[in-house]
Amino acid sequence: MSNRRDTIFALSSGRPPAAIAVVRVSGPAARDALTALAGRVPQPRQATLLRLKIPYSDGGGPHLNSAVEPIDDALVLWFPGPRSETGEDTAEFQLHGGYAVVAAVLSALGTVEGLRPAGPGEFTRRAFENGKLDLTRVEGLADLIGAETEAQRRQAFHQLNGLLGDRAERWRRRLTEALAFVEASIDFPDEDVVSEQVIQPALAMAKELEQEISDLLADSHRGERLREGLTIAVAGPVNVGKSSIVNRLTKRSAAIVSPHAGTTRDIIEVHLDLGGFPVTILDTAGIRETDDPVEEEGVGRARARAEASDLVLWVTDATLKDSLPPPAHLTKAGGPPVWVLSNKSDLAQGKNPQTASDGHTVRCGSMARYRISALTGASFEDLVGGLAEYARQFFSEGGESALVTRQRHRSALADCAEALRQACAEEASGREDIIAEELRLASRALGRLIGRVDVENVLDVIFRDFCIGK
């Protein structure tokens, strides 16, 4: 439980002006705040319309000041702890969302003894410390607030509702049961029958759990990638229209377009929502041999980012009979899929186009070739549809929502799986004490995952990303 004795308050809704503003108060003096501003404490969990006024104190506690103009008529709610979002006494004021109204209420709360402004994420941190949320749910809440696409929202919502945390709790209970078996064997060292009966079930549970976690970790980092977004690099020779393609995909002038070769020197990143999935489009420098050291650096960066991307769109000029094919470093085994975009199809009429005239798109597995025009938009609808489908398949591999969404989750689960493997490796030796210790380490790793143990060093990092009032 939280050992704080102070009470915090903050604006929890968006920055005014707005139709409605919500001010929250949490802590032992929340009742005093209600009495000071609203004159009374409403029935628990019932929205009550009350007139807020500026409080005063005569040394015997805060009181409603009837001699001054009221601040606002507000819906007031009272949530006695521990049946509240933070686990503490909590009050909520739903106000009209003007600057002056919000400022007056915050100023009035600041005069109530024992109240102070909240820091970033402090309401959520108190909920965590009071057992209302485990750490995976806290991270899910942070991701939900920061979600920019529908897929990110779904993943964050599942995490907030315990998709990983609940499973980790079930795993911990199974580990506790296995550990109890092993410790029973240690407590009765002379009972061979007892030892044989309990060690085997314990190790069988450990093996099963290790396999479950290992299967979970073999997910191609889908959860982390969904938080970060799919990376698509637009690459190719100079003057083939890469920047025009980026601008057409993003529906804005994100990149400079020029008839002069080598205009793009550095990598331009553009973020967009593609079919509900987060995507980062990279406009890279045209690849060619050059004596210009600045352009040469840009070409080097382009090669490196293309190799590290999830998909490469290699752009060629449809008006040329012989165009530069994708280089070997992009088509090697283990590299990203490479789609070929034959651009300037509007100018290729009557010339020797690269692609056959009887089809604009050829797709085979993860490979594709599109005949497009960045100028007219020809076949771009087909290209965008293909990219959206690729993103859907990329993030939906395995069917169910990803459980592991952060590197912290992955590290804790990897530590747990390794401890379980070490425990199982001691089966032949019969060293119950070592088996028990490895099972304890596995349980401790799961405890770190959900925030039960060894998390003080990560709490500040997690909560600093929250806004004030959350």
Label each PLM-derived region with a short phrase.
Residues 51-59, 63-80, 262-290, 308-311, ...:
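Switch I (G2) and immediately adjacent beta-strands of P-loop GTPase domains
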Residues 24, 246, 283:
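Short, acidic/hydrophobic/Gly-rich beta-strand patch recurrent on exposed beta strands
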Residues 295-319:
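Inter-motif core of Ras-like GTPase G domains
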Residues 131, 239, 283:
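Conserved G/P- and acidic residue-centered "switch" motifs that form tight phosphate/ATP-binding loops
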